[in-house]
């Protein structure tokens, strides 16, 4: 019995060392940097921009000109945190392909802002929500 208990303790110790090594210093549930090219990250940012444009009173659509920071956090779904620079495009609202819309360059029409977005996604429930949005 003592031998079995000792084996179990050693096994648990070994397993915890392996898990710590595999996870590194990253905390479970903690924020981690994310690549804007990851499909889930790109979809979340696209959703945030669609919501931003829908809620904006501007007659022109805006789009991301630079991703300053993208992070994600595993919770009871995935939370995405973005800091982006956005600019006003020459395309009016309702345009479907904003990626091909040029930015305004006329001083009176050009407008750039830095925005932060928080998007909450539960993929297995087909749920996505813009939790926070702020632009300056």
From Swiss-Prot:
InterPro entries: Cystatin_dom, Cystatin_sf, Prot_inh_cystat_CS. GO terms for molecular function: cysteine-type endopeptidase inhibitor activity. Residues 1-24 form the signal peptide. Residues 29-124 form the Cystatin domain. A motif (Secondary area of contact) lies at residues 73-77. It is found in: Secreted. Keywords: Disulfide bond, Protease inhibitor, Secreted, Signal, Thiol protease inhibitor. Pfam families: Cystatin (PF00031). SUPFAM superfamilies: Cystatin/monellin (SSF54403). The keyword Signal applies. It comes from the Eukaryota. Expressed by the venom gland. One of its GO terms (cellular component) is vesicle. Disulfide bonds join 91-101, 115-135. Belongs to the cystatin family. Inhibits various C1 cysteine proteases including cathepsin L, papain and cathepsin B. This protein has no toxic activity and its function in the venom is unknown. It may play a role as housekeeping or regulatory protein. This is Cystatin-2.
């Amino acid at each position: 019995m003592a031998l079995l208990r000792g084996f179990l303790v050693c096994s648990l110790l070994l397993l915890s060392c392996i898990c710590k090594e595999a996870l590194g210093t990253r905390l479970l549930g903690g924020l981690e940097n994310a690549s804007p090219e990851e499909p889930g990250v790109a979809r979340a940012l696209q959703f945030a921009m669609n919501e931003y444009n829908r809620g904006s009173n501007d007659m022109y659509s805006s789009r991301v000109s630079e991703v300053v920071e993208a992070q994600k956090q595993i919770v009871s779904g995935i939370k995405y945190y973005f800091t982006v620079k956005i600019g006003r495009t020459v395309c009016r609202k309702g345009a479907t392909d904003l990626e091909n819309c040029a930015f305004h360059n006329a001083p009176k029409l050009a407008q750039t802002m830095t925005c932060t977005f928080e998007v909450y996604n539960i993929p297995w429930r087909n749920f996505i929500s813009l939790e926070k949005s702020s632009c300056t």
